[in-house]
């Protein structure tokens, strides 16, 4: 196995090269042996901004030159690397062939991009150090949080290549793109993707007629036992607030023990106080579809929720569990359809109220 070297090489100056050539000629003629050696100079100034220092959850990481073979151990972070056209060659994956993944275990929102770029799946689920190392990476990306974290392999992987440990529970995909752009030299690609998305987000916000506020954004458990509520630190929460939504507060009295101090992006609700945590006048169901919305409405323990009583329960799509450029773009388009429809409905309702023929 070849371990890539990212250390700087010494550069020979033009004057030294000329001297060596002259010395070689004299040696052939038998007269260079007693000449004094000229000093060899090294290039000390960074070339085009390299090397670069990136501060991570594990401290400072120095990347000597632009990486050419990036390996992502986090399927959540892979989408953002694809977004900025980073040279990612392989990625960890998750269970394949589900409602949100393709047969390789990659998320459906960027599956086609992964296939076009011939991205290789390394493993599914449990991180595999041998598979990661065999991909011959010159930069390794590790999630510091979440179910796809390979943090336990950090010490081993960091011996192979510079390893960036990145927490995604408190960052939007834009923040991740900016970080990865600097680490890979793809700042321009990151900035362009963010600009495209921001333009779409601004147009979306201008077109929306918001449902009643505040809003509870959540991922509903399939067994009806609880939910994860997105906080303002989550990518989902940040996007909603950018669009003008107000996030409903979750009372401390109903937060689960695991919600305290471990993850910043979610609050876990379950048990008899589950319903008390759903304070929003509107429920947005992330990683949910129409069937999920119907299931939530059937849960008799949630019947007293103001959003359910008023019928303000909206599925956001199955691919919104992890927001990257691709899924967030699809979410914006979905919301344009969903809540622009409210505008049309309001218009029709206004016509009905002013049309005597429509009254019973």
Place the predicted regions along the sequence by residue.
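Bacterial signal peptide processing site
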Residues: 32-36
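Proline-aspartate-enriched helix->loop->beta-strand connector
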Residues: 129, 133-142, 162, 274, ...
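A short, structured surface patch at a secondary-structure boundary
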Residues: 78-131, 144
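Basic- and aromatic-lined ligand-binding clefts that recognize polyanionic substrates
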Residues: 69-81, 192-256
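Charged, glycine-enriched surface loops/patches
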Residues: 150-188, 294-315
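Structured C-terminal subdomain patch of bacterial secreted/periplasmic proteins
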Residues: 182, 276-360
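Bacterial N-terminal signal peptides that target proteins for export
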Residues: 3-20
């Amino acid at each position: 196995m070849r371990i890539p070297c990212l250390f700087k090489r010494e550069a020979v100056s033009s004057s030294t090269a000329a001297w060596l050539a002259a010395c070689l000629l004299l040696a052939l003629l038998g007269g260079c042996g007693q000449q004094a050696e000229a000093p060899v100079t090294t290039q000390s100034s960074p070339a085009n901004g390299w090397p670069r220092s990136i501060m991570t959850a594990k401290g400072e990481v120095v990347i000597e030159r632009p990486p050419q073979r990036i390996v992502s151990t986090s399927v959540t972070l892979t989408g953002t690397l694809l977004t900025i056209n980073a040279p990612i060659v392989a990625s960890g994956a998750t269970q394949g062939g589900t409602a949100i993944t393709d047969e390789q275990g990659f998320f459906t929102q960027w599956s086609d991009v992964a296939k076009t770029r011939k991205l290789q799946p390394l493993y599914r689920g449990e991180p595999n150090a041998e598979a990661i190392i065999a991909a011959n990476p010159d930069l390794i990306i590790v999630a510091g949080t979440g179910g796809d974290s390979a943090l336990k392999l950090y010490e081993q992987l960091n011996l192979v290549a510079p390893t960036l440990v990145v927490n995604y529970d408190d960052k939007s995909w834009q923040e991740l793109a900016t970080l990865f752009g600097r680490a890979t030299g793809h700042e321009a690609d990151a900035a362009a993707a963010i600009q495209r998305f921001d333009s779409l987000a601004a147009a979306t916000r201008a077109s929306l007629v918001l449902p009643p506020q505040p809003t509870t954004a959540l991922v509903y458990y399939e067994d009806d036992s609880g939910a994860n509520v997105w906080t303002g630190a989550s990518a989902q929460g940040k996007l909603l607030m950018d669009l003008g939504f107000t996030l409903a507060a979750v009372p401390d009295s109903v937060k689960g023990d695991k919600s305290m101090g471990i993850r910043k992006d979610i609050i876990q609700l379950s048990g008899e106080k589950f319903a008390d945590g759903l304070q929003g006048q509107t429920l947005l169901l992330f990683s949910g579809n129409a069937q999920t919305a119907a299931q939530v409405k059937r849960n008799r323990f949630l019947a007293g929720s103001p959003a359910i009583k008023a019928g303000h329960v909206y599925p956001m799509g199955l691919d919104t569990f992890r927001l990257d450029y691709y899924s967030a773009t699809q979410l914006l388009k979905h919301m344009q359809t969903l809540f622009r429809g409210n505008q049309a409905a309001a218009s029709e309702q206004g016509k009905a109220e002013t049309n005597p023929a429509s009254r019973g």
